[in-house]
Amino acid sequence: MRHTLALAVAAVTCLAAPVGAQEADLTVVPPVPADYRPKTTSWGEPDFRGGWPIDHLNGRTPLQRDPAHGNRAFLTEAEFAQRAETVEQLARRYETEDSQGTMGIGHWAEVAAANRRTSWIVSPANGRLPEFTAEGKRLSGEMRSTWRRGQPFDTWLDFDSWDRCITRGLPASMFPFMYNNGMRIFQSPGLVALQMEMVHETRLIPTDGSAPVPRQIRNWLGESRGRWENGNTLVVETTNFRPGPSATNIGTTGSPPANDTPVSSEAKLVETFTMTGPDSIVYDFTWSDPTIFTAPWSARLDWVRDDEFQIFEYACHEGNVQIRNYITASRAERAQERESSQ
């Protein structure tokens, strides 16, 4: 049932390729439509309130583009058909569990319909993350995570912020994941709140011209300041990031193979949320971190309204036992290795 809904949603979203995709220039990313004017709140600001889950984007579009696609932002018809078949095979797990009266990974990992995007990254033109600086490589090598193969665990410092159910960080939290893709926007005079289902975080974004906080005050999700432009766009600038979380997350298809993309104190995120229709938002962002990357990089995702989407509590690892279990198991494994080598 949910898969059927995803098929319908995907048909009208995901930065669709122009009509006649085979003849069109598949390297061109269309400009964001700018003529729609949403209704306003009672205090006169554009009204973005509602549910904006990104489940429909979880259809095998990777963060980074396959080098074989070059500078193409969209798939060819043949490539799209192949992706659609792959997604359909994944979705059948869901339907099989329904027919058998069981519930397992098929229900846990939500799969949407395929779309034509070759990557979420739109800049650089090759759709891939820029190279690390020398300092970025050094810091990446020092990061600790359960996603690093062969890494021992002796202390909580051997785990990343997502392992510890604290945060996926930014901009990683804004990309689709295999589950928990709920987003909801709340507004009050001078403030926008963006609730995220994953790790039940909420971003608070003042839009009242509040002065930035001192640079020495740093948070996992940084400090955001927003402003309204053109009657249909929320622009958000975020700085003051606390180093620690990875800027990319392995749970998003096509991300680096471990949560080891560092975030420095120089990182800056500039986002635009442009309402292009009563039920659509184009979400663009640019991430710049000159300490880590040799160049900024940008991504685009298309949001679709779903005010019926419900966000439930995400307990992550209830009882907070996961870290202890990892450490206990890691120490036991190493003890066995020492005994066997004697």
Protein language model annotation of sequence segments:
Residues 1-4:
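Positively charged n-region of N-terminal signal peptides that target proteins for export
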Residues 6-16:
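Bacterial N-terminal signal peptides
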Residues 20-342:
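PEST-like low-complexity, intrinsically disordered acidic/proline/serine-rich tracts
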